[in-house]
UniProtKB/Swiss-Prot annotation:
GO BP term (any one): regulation of DNA replication
Quaternary structure annotation from Swiss-Prot or TrEMBL: Homotrimer. The subunits circularize to form a toroid; DNA passes through its center. Replication factor C (RFC) is required to load the toroid on the DNA.
Keywords: DNA replication, DNA-binding
Gene3D superfamilies: 3.70.10.10
Higher taxonomy: Archaea, Methanobacteriati, Methanobacteriota, Methanomada group, Methanococci
Domain of life where this protein originates: Archaea
Pfam families: PCNA_C, PCNA_N
Protein family (similarity comment): Belongs to the PCNA family.
GO molecular function, one term: DNA binding
Role noted for this protein: Sliding clamp subunit that acts as a moving platform for DNA processing. Responsible for tethering the catalytic subunit of DNA polymerase and other proteins to DNA during high-speed replication.
Stated name of the protein: DNA polymerase sliding clamp
């Protein structure tokens, strides 16, 4: 069986963040919580989410692989209100996931499931020379600046600085976060540099994977030269991890 009760607002944020990159996913359910990983259709980005049982108000789960249409689930979850309880209930016989919103009124939806098994995708264990922790709001603003210039951006770590750089045929954009300057707002919360590095990425993907963040969310970004960028952040105890392949420059 599988049945879980949680806060609608937090679950909505996790689903929105995941569905920005993939259309369908397999929830791996067991007694410890929910896990899922999937590649985007172009195999450029990987998304992984983990919701331990502790983030739920009530949780009962046996081992199940639940293949779900994320776009359908996202539309249903969007109908939920922040003060409503969200109840997820697996109907094995009918092969459906029941989604119930409960307050003084009870609303129930059912989603047909895909007959799929877990892809066993895992986030690869890569050793990165550099990592930074930065407020999502500041990172997103730098992406907006870069978008004015090009559809690709370069993430650089050099001389105690984290740099977001974009160059077009005529124009360029650069945002520099200097670890050596005192920052009362702590925009750059952590900076660990092992070596200078630079990698270039598709801007649209970076926008998608940060679209559901709040300004004060802390992004942990792992970087190395011509390596995939790994971005992690948490939503009320749930963990989201994104891996994006670099654009290899000739």
């Amino acid at each position: 069986m599988f049945r879980a009760t949680c806060n609608t607002r937090d679950f909505k944020k996790v689903i929105n963040a995941t569905s920005n990159l993939v259309d369908e996913i397999c929830f791996e359910v067991d007694e410890n919580g929910i896990k899922a990983s999937a590649m985007d259709p172009s195999h450029v980005a990987l998304v992984s989410m983990e919701m331990p049982k502790e983030v739920f108000e009530e949780y009962e789960g046996d081992i199940h692989d639940i293949g779900i249409d994320l776009e359908a689930l996202k539309k249903i979850i969007a109908r939920g209100k922040g003060d409503e309880k969200l109840i997820l209930d697996l109907d094995v016989e009918k092969n459906k996931l029941n989604v119930t919103f409960k307050s003084n009124v009870t609303r129930k939806f059912s989603i047909a499931l895909y007959d799929v098994s877990s892809s066993n995708l895992k986030v690869p264990d890569i050793e990165y020379p550099n990592n930074v922790s930065i407020k999502a709001g500041a990172f997103v603003e730098a992406l907006k600046d870069a978008e004015l210039v090009n559809d690709h951006i370069t993430l650089k770590v050099d001389e105690d600085k984290f740099i977001i750089y974009s160059k077009g045929d005529l124009n360029q954009s650069e945002t520099v976060f200097d670890n050596g300057i005192e920052d009362d707002d702590a925009t750059l919360a952590e900076f660990n540099m092992g070596e200078a590095s630079r990698s270039t990425f598709n801007l649209a993907y970076l926008k998608d994977l940060t679209k559901s963040t709040a300004a004060e969310d802390l992004l942990k970004i792992y970087l190395g030269s011509d390596m995939p960028v790994k971005i992690e952040y948490e939503v009320s105890g749930s963990k989201l991890v994104f891996l994006l392949a670099p654009r290899i420059e000739s």
